[in-house]
Design a protein with these regions (language model features):
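Hydrophobic alpha-helical transmembrane segments of multi-pass membrane transport proteins
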Residues: 16-23, 27, 56, 73-95, ...
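Hydrophobic/aromatic residues within transmembrane alpha-helices
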Residues: 31, 41, 45, 92, ...
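Hydrophobic transmembrane alpha-helices of multi-pass small-molecule transport proteins
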Residues: 53, 115, 124-143, 160, ...
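Glycine-/small-residue-enriched transmembrane alpha-helix faces in small-molecule transporters
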Residues: 1-40, 44, 146-172, 193
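Specific alpha-helical transmembrane segments that line the substrate/conduction pathway
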Residues: 40-42, 46-50, 89-123, 159, ...
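Small-residue-rich packing faces within the transmembrane alpha-helices of Major Facilitator Superfamily
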Residues: 22-23, 47-51, 136, 189-193, ...
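Transmembrane alpha-helices of multi-pass small-molecule transport proteins
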Residues: 33-84, 111-112, 162-169, 184-203, ...
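C-terminal-most transmembrane helix of multi-pass membrane proteins
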Residues: 7, 46, 55-58, 130, ...
Length: 288
């Protein structure tokens, strides 16, 4: 298989992942309206996936065994990467508008480039700097006016850093070369344990919900924490963490379109300019 075909597959996988993630705010708002909290959604997203993947691995007869080195890498990636990202991003929604929090979270391509530069000696190319500049302009445009605290801004930005850690750790430790279903299972398992432990102190996970809410949580889990996550893992494997993180910028654009079409959100000048800036960013980045 030629390098061009491999790269195209990587771009498609990552773009599909970003689009699926971008659809999640619509489903999340519906579930919250039925009595769930942000931490409830975070918990059941990974809890459901852990159970489903356990039986999938059993049926496919995939070995559960992990080498000690891989076990440590998966634990660190889950607890301080994907798990911590879900927790602190959801917590930031309690302090700032969700639009601002999500926009600040999308500083993570910058953090990915910085982490790869400082810890792995990768050079930041001129094209990446130009592309990232447009992306930052787009993110700033997406930031709607609203009240918020500095602590909320800090949490949202920190979630971008932890997500960057997740992407880089998967790429540089070779975790993406592991069976995708097996990796997703262990990431979900450790994140479930992490959120459950935190809830022992916070008591914020709601269990008294109707059947529809539980059904929607299952759909959310299978689409976001399973399908989109596996697609992203394959995208990182084929593209590397830096390229993949830029393609993920399709997510806020998707969220904006979904908000306008289904949530009655207005198409403001800032949103339009933000979407255009991110599209330009992607065109520059993808241009050979």
């Amino acid at each position: 298989m030629g390098m061009g075909v491999i790269m195209r597959k990587g771009y498609i996988y990552t773009a599909l992942s970003a689009i699926i993630f971008g659809l999640m705010p619509l489903l999340t708002k519906i579930i919250i309206a039925r009595g769930a909290t942000s931490l409830t959604i975070a918990f059941f997203r990974v809890f459901y996936v852990t159970i489903v993947l356990f039986f999938v691995l059993k049926l496919k007869k995939i070995d559960f065994h992990l080498e000690k080195r891989d076990l440590l890498s998966v634990m660190l990636t889950s607890i301080f990467g994907s798990g911590l990202t879900i927790i602190i991003l959801n917590e930031s929604y309690n302090y700032v508008d969700t639009g601002i929090a999500t926009s600040l979270h999308f500083l993570y391509p910058l953090f990915v480039a910085i982490l790869c530069c400082f810890f792995y000696g990768e050079k930041i190319k001129k094209k990446q700097i130009i592309s990232l500049s447009f992306a930052l302009v787009g993110i700033i445009c997406f930031m709607s006016k609203g009240n918020g605290s500095l602590f909320g801004y800090f949490l949202a930005i920190a979630s971008g850093l932890t997500y960057a850690f997740y992407l880089v750790k998967m790429d540089k430790t070779g975790l993406v070369k592991m069976n995708a279903l097996k990796l997703s299972f262990y990431l979900a398992l450790f994140t479930t344990i992490e959120i459950f432990t935190i809830n022992l102190f916070m008591q914020d996970v709601v269990f008294k919900m109707d059947a529809i809410a539980y059904g929607l949580l299952l759909v959310l889990a299978l689409s976001a924490s399973f399908l989109a996550t596996v697609l992203l893992q394959q995208g990182v494997l084929l593209l590397g963490s830096t390229r993949a993180s830029f393609i993920c910028l399709l997510e806020p654009v998707t969220s904006m379109i979904v908000g306008i079409l289904f949530l009655g959100e207005a198409l403001t000048l800032n949103k339009g300019l933000g979407g255009l800036a991110i599209i330009i960013s992607l065109i520059i980045f993808l241009k050979e």
